[in-house]
Amino acid sequence: MRFSIIIPAYNAEDHIRKALGSVRSQTFKDYELIVVCDSCTDNTESIAREYGARTEAVSYHADGPTRNRGLELAQGEWILFMDDDDWWLHEYVLELLDEKIRENPYADIICFSFIFRHLGYARPVRRLNGQHWIACWSKCYRRDRIGSARFSSTTSGAADVPFFADMFNKGLTVLDWDMPLYYYNYWRGGSISEKQTTDFRGHGELL
């Protein structure tokens, strides 16, 4: 299997269909979709199954361990993450990534650009540097190079930091690709990570 797409979800029945639909509409079909439902009390899990996702219910109350569980379940050669209120911009995202992987067989991580939306305003983020570098959903990872790297169990919004610290310490080959593939909603109250200003907090440890 080429790709595993991991979505951590928390009471996402009102918005997750757009995320799931952007995956199911992909022209490249060699993938699996994994939705890990963290402490959900609504219909998130049943909706995910409607879209062909493998699902698992957990009670971590934190984004990091939920993503870690997705990594444990994943079987694809390459890993992608998506938040439950975000989506891919095109139906050919996986097709483009597969082509880029074939063109760059040495790459361990492929970083791509994204659209950043906050308070109703959306703008493209074209260079992945500074605080935007540390965001797990704007990258595609070779699974056998992730190894033991895992997200933190913190609820402060810095769960990505130890994951990337471990990845960087491996001396992996990173390809920075200026191609927007992802639509990122910066804030939605009630999400697992409470996106707001916490998503990038603590990332200075790596910069």
Where are these regions (language model features)?
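Conserved nucleotide-sugar donor-binding catalytic segment
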Residues: 112, 124-201
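Conserved donor NDP-sugar-binding/catalytic core segment of glycosyltransferases
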Residues: 87, 91-124
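Cell-envelope/extracellular polymer assembly enzymes that use nucleotide-activated donors
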Residues: 1-4, 22, 32, 162
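Glycine-rich, basic loop-to-helix element that forms the pyrophosphate-binding segment
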Residues: 58-74
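Short, well-formed alpha-helical segments that are part of the catalytic scaffolds
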Residues: 11-25
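Acidic helix N-cap motif at the loop->helix transition within catalytic regions
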Residues: 15-17, 42-50
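A conserved acidic beta->alpha catalytic loop
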Residues: 22, 29, 36-46, 83, ...
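Short aromatic/hydrophobic "clamp" motif used to bind/position activated sugar donors
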Residues: 79
